[in-house]
Amino acid sequence: MLPPINFKGWIDENRHLLKPPVGNKCVYTEAGDFIVMVVGGPNSRKDYHYNESEELFYQVEGDIVVKIIEDGVPRDIPVREGEMFLLPARVPHSPQRGPGSIGLVIEKVRDDKDTDGLMWFCDNCGNKLYDEYFHLENIVTQLPPVMKRFNESTEARTCDSCGSVMTPPTASK
């Protein structure tokens, strides 16, 4: 059994590791049922994450906006410091974190049958540009290579509906 931790102390000790583009670090690497991570801002993401299970967001410092696609329609959900938000399963989402923001995110460890995905939508017309699905085993290491593949591919970033080309996100500092 793991002992309790001083969460605020943990954040202070690990703040330097919360870097773009995703900026997350797992609190408990030994956990079997949950992925418990802290995510820092700013971030520079244009992707939407697809998860077959719910995700719990608790905003510790600063505010964020969780962009979602609900029934094919984009929507913004503000989550302010001190607020908690339970995102339903299978809702594409893109947390937008401002400078200095810190949030706790709790997700279920994926079963063998679970599939995660990253997807991008055209900034101009909302058409889906690209998606890639995978079995998630390590959230810290698996997302950046998918983002890199998309960002480095002009073909993937070009909308086949309106011809607009998505500009890769600018790295946040």
Label each region the model flagged:
Residues 1-40, 45-47, 142-173:
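A short, N-terminal "cap"/entry segment at the start of jelly-roll beta-barrel domains
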Residues 36, 47-49, 54-59, 76-77, ...:
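His/acidic/aromatic-lined binding-pocket segments of jelly-roll/cupin-type domains
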Residues 39, 78-99, 107-108:
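Conserved metal-binding segment of the jelly-roll/cupin
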Residues 39-40, 50-69, 103-106:
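Short, conserved beta-strand element in jelly-roll/cupin
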Residues 99-117:
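A short hydrophobic beta-strand segment most commonly corresponding to one strand
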Residues 110, 126-131, 165-166:
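Cys/His-rich microdomains that often coordinate metals
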Residues 120-125, 159-162:
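Short cysteine-rich clusters marking metal-coordination/redox-active sites
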Residues 126-150:
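Short recognition patches in nucleic-acid-associated and regulatory proteins
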